[in-house]
């Protein structure tokens, strides 16, 4: 989001905190530590240099929770009214960057919690249609064929997912052309994720719940994951 829009969302969240009726109806943004997106060499990632229609991965707000970073190659929709599985509404405020084409979402599927690992990924952004995918330019989870529209807040287009992917809030600085992750919006699946994969994550190092601080390393999915399942 642009900086002034980020301030507006924070103000709206604060206002909702003082109005119980609004809290019951709307899902407020969840703010986490600020983490600047950086390339593999540690240099700040430049939004204008982010390749279009490629899957990029970073981890936020925890060390083990993966997210998609996507340049859609076209402006995302300016806003979308969405709701969580428990019927809390929220408004997604569109893409960021020079063309407002950059979006970010949790890469944990809202149905069965499939996510990209270093070995395999059943979920990714697909520009093409297929026999099982009637939509182009969607995030498609091949585990149960949930499909999400990244240009409209990850709205569910098909499949059993009960809600959109949680959006990752990005603060874009046009002066430096840099991106900073600041929080989430929508239905988080982090608690369910940690409960389901507790043993696996423990075997991978035991720091899965460590909050991400200062920076997030961004890597292309094909360089992060050995096998991408296509469907």
Where are the language model's segments positioned?
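N-terminal secretory signal peptides and thylakoid transit peptides that target proteins
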Residues: 1-14
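Short Cys/His-centered divalent metal-binding micro-motifs
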Residues: 114, 141-152
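N-terminal pre-ligand scaffold of iron-sulfur
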Residues: 23-127, 171-231
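Short beta-strand-alpha-helix junction that forms the catalytic/metal-binding core
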Residues: 99-106, 130-142
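Polybasic, low-complexity binding patches
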Residues: 121-122, 128-137, 149-182
